[in-house]
Amino acid sequence: MYKRLGPTCAVNPRAMRESEYTLEKAVEPKKVMVIGGGVAGMEAARMAAKFGHPVELYEKSDVLGGELLAAGNRPLKTEVAELNDWYQLELKELRIPIHLNTTVTADMVKAAKPDVAILALGASSVMPRSIPGIDHAKSVSAIDALSGKKPVGDTVVVVGGGEIGCETAMHFVLQGKKVALVEALPDIMSVEFVPNQHKNMLKDMLEHHKIPIYTSHRLMEINDEGALIAPAEEEAFTLKADTVVVSVGMRANPSFASELVGTEIEVYEIGAGRRVGNIYNAVHDAYEIIYNL
């Protein structure tokens, strides 16, 4: 509702476009294989079934949801967890076969012989290899920290002042932890698009909880003491921390789409695997592809 797109909805591509997007069954159903059980993959599988295509969904982990699992734990984003629950109920009601703990390869796709392969391979946290100590025991990505994959101590430094970093800082402050936020740029949430209402609310919350924010500071090292940071052209100093949470962006996961070139399979890449974006991008990508099969 905030990107000058006219009236729209992040999770309902048909909103205000009902006459354009009809729900008629496909005249020629196609066998669809969806690889990736995040929001884009779940939407693709759901709509494929709705349009009458036989579809199966494959997910490499033991649970569906992808980035929704971590996002649903962030302050002001509890509705994301509810969205994940809703998708899984939809998939169950539509009786879509779901294959968990299954890492799909190009050879597996070729052997399955679908008419359509939807690659919703998602994205992973950027962990800059150039930073000494990035693999230190105290270092953890924001996604792993929020989803509970790794424990987080009582004193936390969050590196990265984008929307996810700010929400991560608030998440742990609300748990009673002592948190500091570090951002390389002169202001937080200044690069990616964040709706003004949400940005202002987050800034107010950070200020209300008196979270120290070190703008124009770069992470130099993660060590036994915590995070070594430095302002421009000044001496570095250490912020002591039990855990250093790194939130400096996402990168699309590797794709095997090129290995399917030359087959008769229609191949589409959707969601964060095609371009790192948000729920709106993932859902609308999936819907557009399935609608036009």
Name what the model sees in each region:
Residues 54-94, 171-217, 274:
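Rossmann-like dinucleotide-binding cores of NAD(P)H-dependent redox enzymes
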Residues 1-29:
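Cysteine-cluster motifs in flexible loop/terminal segments that predominantly coordinate metals
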Residues 3-7, 119-138:
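Positively charged, proline/Ser/Thr-rich regional signature most characteristic
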Residues 73-77, 117, 135-137, 197-200, ...:
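Short, hinge-like loop/turn segments at secondary-structure boundaries
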Residues 91-98, 135-138, 206-212, 263-266:
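A short helix-to-beta-strand connector/capping loop
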Residues 26-60, 64, 99-113, 121-131, ...:
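Rossmann-like dinucleotide/flavin-binding elements
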Residues 84, 100-103, 141-143, 215-217, ...:
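Short loop/edge segments at beta-strand edges and connector loops
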